[in-house]
């Protein structure tokens, strides 16, 4: 029997400390340099030398403001605030590496699918096929308020919207441009064949999109899809869409049961039990 191959992802966030709250005060800690590009390019080079498979970048939209009904502690301790956009780091890190992959968290609840499709196609081009998307739907009421809502959408409704969102993205990434659409014919003055570029028309419960995908086909077209939801609805979503799932169980027994349930959900979704790679937080 062939040996299983372990895959290693580093886990970070475009902020001070990430989940190691308070460690930024240690004399040897350099995470306050997160604002500077060399901090990230040096990290990328180090991970590549260490034969890591990828760098997983977390993100949040919103702030932690529940404790004492304010953000005072969040700001004093720098608990994922301030936090910068993770997607903008990727091209710089890709430029100094050859094999390192990048999984970037983007909350789809507050992004229009048409624009997000272009952003990830652009990242896929610039990384030459090394980009992944960690799909999240959000969990902070502060984010909902910042985006013009009174509170978060109900949990399961967020995943219903996410299913439709992915349906649109697949149409844009996989269906708008045929494989032979890009000719780059300088003599004939034809960059792309109009007959092979198609308008996407989607009219659903939550989204209406009518347009051509703005980016030409990228190396992967659809990025590697990560998901980290542990609820029943989140696992059903992962079973339908994900290629990689991130879990952080409190012990082995819980982790084993989480993976077993996920494998069952994959079969129910018409996929093979081993179609998804599971990454465990450590």
Segments predicted by a language model, with ranges:
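Active-site-proximal loop/turn and secondary-structure-junction residues that shape catalytic pockets
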Residues: 14, 61, 106-110, 137-141, ...
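Internal, glycine-rich beta/alpha segment that forms the wall or movable "lid"
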Residues: 4, 112-241, 269, 274
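N-terminal beta1-alpha1-beta2 module of alpha/beta enzyme domains
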Residues: 1-96, 220-223
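Glycine-rich, aromatic-lined ligand/substrate-binding cores of catalytic
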Residues: 236-281
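Short, solvent-exposed loop/turn and secondary-structure capping segments
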Residues: 19-23, 66-69, 136, 144-146, ...
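Generic structural signal for well-ordered alpha-helices
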Residues: 40, 44, 87-91, 117-121, ...
């Amino acid at each position: 029997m062939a040996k299983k191959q372990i895959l290693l992802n580093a886990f970070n966030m475009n902020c001070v400390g990430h989940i190691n709250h308070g460690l930024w005060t240690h004399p040897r800690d350099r995470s306050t340099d997160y604002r500077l590009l060399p901090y990230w390019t040096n990290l990328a080079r180090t991970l590549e030398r260490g034969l890591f498979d990828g760098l997983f970048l977390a993100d949040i939209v919103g702030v932690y403001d529940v404790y004492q009904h304010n953000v005072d502690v969040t700001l004093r301790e720098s608990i994922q605030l301030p936090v910068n956009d993770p997607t903008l780091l990727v091209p710089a890190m890709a430029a100094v590496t050859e094999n390192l992959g990048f999984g970037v968290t983007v909350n789809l609840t507050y992004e229009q699918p048409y624009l997000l499709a272009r952003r990830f196609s652009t990242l896929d081009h610039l990384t030459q096929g090394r980009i992944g998307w960690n799909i999240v739907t959000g969990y902070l009421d502060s984010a909902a308020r910042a985006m013009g809502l009174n509170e978060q959408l109900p949990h399961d409704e967020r995943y219903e919207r996410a299913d439709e969102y992915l349906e649109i993205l697949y149409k844009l990434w996989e269906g708008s441009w045929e494989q032979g659409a890009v000719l780059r014919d300088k003599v004939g003055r034809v960059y792309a064949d109009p007959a092979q570029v198609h308008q996407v028309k989607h009219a659903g419960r939550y989204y209406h999109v009518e347009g051509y995908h703005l980016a030409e086909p990228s190396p992967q077209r659809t990025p590697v899809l990560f998901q980290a939801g542990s609820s029943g609805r989140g696992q059903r979503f992962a079973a339908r869409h994900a290629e990689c799932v991130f879990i952080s169980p409190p012990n082995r027994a819980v982790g084993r049961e989480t993976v077993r349930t996920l494998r069952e959900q994959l079969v129910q979704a018409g996929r093979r039990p081993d179609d998804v790679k599971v990454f465990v937080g450590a």
